[in-house]
Amino acid sequence: MTILLQRAKFKKRLMPILFPLMLAGCTNLFGSNFQDVLRNDANASSEFYMNKIEQTREVEDQQTYKLLAARVLVTENKTAQAEALLAELTKLTPEQQLDKSILDALIAAVKRDNDSASALLKTIPLAQLSQSQTSRYYEVQARIAENKTDIIEAVKARIQMDMALTDVQRKQDNIDKIWALLRSGNKTLINTTQPEGNVALAGWLDLTKAYNDNLSQPSQLAQALQNWKTTYPNHSAAYLFPTELKSLSNFTQTQVNKIALLLPLSGNASILGSTIKSGFDDSRGADKSVQVDVIDTMAMPVTDAIALAKQNGDGMIVGPLLKDNVDVILSNPTAVQGMNVLALNSTPNARAIDKMCYYGLAPEDEAEAAANRMWNDGVRQPIVAVPQSDLGQRTASAFNVRWQQLAASDADVRYYNQPDDAAYNLTADPAQNQAIYIVVTDSEQLMSIKGALDNSGVKAKIYTNSRNNSSNNAVEYRLAMEGVTFSDIPFFKDLDGEQYKKIEAATGGDYSLMRLYAMGADSWLLAHSFNELRQVPGFSLSGLTGKLTAGPNCNVERDLTWYSYQGGNIVPLN
């Protein structure tokens, strides 16, 4: 009993001390100090923060959630929505106003308003920022430099950003961006830049030099990168290696002994398969060191063709060509386990599968190339006219995805059923006489659309795809297309060359078949550099269908050649 009374008296004396502390703790959790979260990273989705705005009654806390939501919306490429949220804010606390200033500067940089972004940064007291806010401050500096294509200044800003970042994933993302910047720089810039005592910059420059100097010899590249790690053991990139370079640790040079070529060589698609095979065979030439087993996918199910290739001991499959057959592999990738596969088509189901790449003459490549070309030509408000079809949907999506990456905004996409529809949609908005990317299925469509635009007085610069380019086009067509720019494979640059004449005779001058022939020729090249293509970032091959590199999911991307109609002739452009 005595012990119990003593405990009761002790608790009674302790409560006056603990109670204020408990209240103080509650204030930190529920009171005005909630806005301290602005000093930290925003790790949730914009949807999460938007829901919190609706659930919260305190105006001050609502505004904090709006700032967090706007911050994430910018990272989700939803700048307009972020600006709309910021416009709702009133009577901010000093901490909220500080966070908004950083966000306003970032939005200005995203919109390429460098002067406004720089002016806003000057109003921000850098010494008062948390580590998270400091990283965001330097991200704005980096974006301003990136807008000016000042690679080294952008890298310097991101090095400062790296020093402030604490989250591992954010550090990895930033390291990957530094690496992408340096990889985009030419060798002269990298080799002549002086680090001026900046040890981190010196490490990045040496890493880039090691990569550039050994890119043509991938077997030596892995060792060069390991030597760099030994030289810079404390460098941030030594702890978190650029994601692109991680696959090089287990790189082995491509060795091809036996190839299974899976093509439709009978039935309705035989003309496609036989043309690709001709290109493949001619590229192979007299090289008999590699055995090629040709399998007709029209004569047996593709599953049986794969089983036959395995039975033959083929280590690599080139093909299949038809999309349905590619989907068969995608639905059961274990069927090709242990084999390299260069599929000659892609489907909406395509995804990253170990030792599998996708190569074809996809219209998406042309759409992405058009976005790049128009951006480099100074176009900022493109109109994209595409047919209301699968081709139109795919090209419009590919163009817009690339345009969002370049301009942080959507392209103006307009669909048409008939050429007359396209002409009407384009002439109905004369204020947009800037530049139009027109996707057509043949030259007659382009003739109709351009004729209507000319008659209506629209003076927009016209870009288009390769399907307008046909051997059947007479000089009258080429004159009518004066000034039109289009993309196509580089093979068509030399119409007087011996190789062109040979293929022209073999295909009857049909440009569609000539493109397939070139694809077959390039598939031989790709097969012999398969590991390099998959594992060495930036590795490229100069083929008949373009400069070939591996994109996401090992989808082979083609850097196309641009041509222009000038004085009745087709002139290659730089």
Swiss-Prot record:
A lipid is attached at residue 26 (N-palmitoyl cysteine). GO terms for cellular component: periplasmic side of cell outer membrane. Gene3D superfamilies: 1.25.40.650, 3.40.50.2300, Tetratricopeptide repeat domain. Keywords: Cell outer membrane, Cell shape, Lipoprotein, Membrane, Palmitate, Peptidoglycan synthesis, Signal. GO terms for molecular function: enzyme regulator activity. Residues 1-25 form the signal peptide. A lipid is attached at residue 26 (S-diacylglycerol cysteine). CDD domains: PBP1_YraM_LppC_lipoprotein-like (cd06339). GO terms for biological process: peptidoglycan biosynthetic process; regulation of cell shape. It is a lipid-anchor. It is found in: Cell outer membrane. Regulator of peptidoglycan synthesis that is essential for the function of penicillin-binding protein 1A (PBP1a). PANTHER family: PENICILLIN-BINDING PROTEIN ACTIVATOR LPOA. Interacts with PBP1a. Belongs to the LpoA family. This is Penicillin-binding protein activator LpoA. It comes from Mannheimia succiniciproducens (strain KCTC 0769BP / MBEL55E).
